[in-house]
Swiss-Prot record:
Sample GO molecular function, one term: oxidoreductase activity, acting on NAD(P)H, quinone or similar compound as acceptor
Family, similarity comment: Belongs to the complex I subunit 1 family.
Domain of life: Bacteria
Main location class: membrane
A Gene Ontology BP annotation from the UniProt entry: aerobic respiration
Keywords: Membrane, NAD, Quinone, Translocase, Transmembrane, Transmembrane helix, Ubiquinone
Record InterPro entries: NADH_UbQ_OxRdtase_su1/FPO, NADH_UbQ_OxRdtase_su1_CS
Listed EC numbers: 7.1.1.-
Quaternary structure note: NDH-1 is composed of 14 different subunits. Subunits NuoA, H, J, K, L, M, N constitute the membrane sector of the complex.
Known catalytic reactions: a quinone + NADH + 5 H(+)(in) = a quinol + NAD(+) + 4 H(+)(out)
Residue spans, topological domain Cytoplasmic: 36-86, 131-156, 212-245, 297-313
Record's protein name: NADH-quinone oxidoreductase subunit H
Localization: Cellular chromatophore membrane
Amino acid sequence: MADFWATSLGQTLILLAQGLGIIAFVMIGLLLLVWGDRKIWAAVQMRKGPNVVGAFGLLQSVADAAKYVFKEIVVPAGVDKPVYFLAPMLSLVLALLAWVVVPFNEGWVMADINVAVLFVFAVSSLEVYGVIMGGWASNSKYPFLGSLRSAAQMISYEVSMGLIIVGVIISTGSMNLSAIVEAQRGDFGLLNWYWLPHLPMVALFFISALAETNRPPFDLPEAESELVAGFMVEYSSTPYLLFMAGEYIAVWLMCALTSVLFFGGWLSPIPGVPDGVLWMVAKMAAVFFVFAMVKAIVPRYRYDQLMRIGWKVFLPLSLAWVVVVAFLAKFEVLGGFWARWSIGA
């Protein structure tokens, strides 16, 4: 039997099982994210939120998904049908694809590649094409304006996110996400994690993640008061559901990246307590809680404010931080965190 799993067919079946496992985890997380988002928002507004379908309203997301699937797909006149239907599918597939390099535990990763960080950013950069295609193919000015906003917004904040992660890569000496987690292992638990040496950049990374995923207060591409639903105005039923699923999966991915890069991934925060996948999921849930709270309490920015913050504040700060981290690593000024990799050695 062991010989069978070593064959090409056996390896293919293993990869298929891993892929299905990742999809199941992400989809279950998607349903819980939507439920949690609505519950947290309701609590802030002193409402109950979903509380009828299932215990504590847990099945409300399933009921809503079923409602969208069984609704009629209304296709407006004048749309480019192939591109119109391809756009939401592309958004969902790309959002799922980035998960193949995310480690959930030691050895629990589908593709443990040495350029995992680059892979995630490459796939995330492609997600904007689904939005642009949907806005352009809808043959309407509101979706098109929303898609243009999204393209400019995502490109602007990807630059800052990339520079912030360069600082983490310098500290670790690797672009492998599993190696980044292991580099944060130490005798002092959470004090060994990168949130401490990179503290100024954790907040910038989180805010950039909000803008990258079009979450409030940076949800300008789908601003209800201005563009109704932005690039999704002309979508209904299953295509609309695919767009929304892609957005929440991208948010879930950013929660995972934040946990891996700055909060030790699957590592236990308490010395002596075993590491494991539960710690990873708990950290992702904690990051999403902050996402949801920001959505509930922070008002939306104007578009000019959004772009000004990205280019005039975040970009210079993140670039300066890369220089600082490179200097500390090169000359081993502080040792410890910064002596992991000697640049040019």
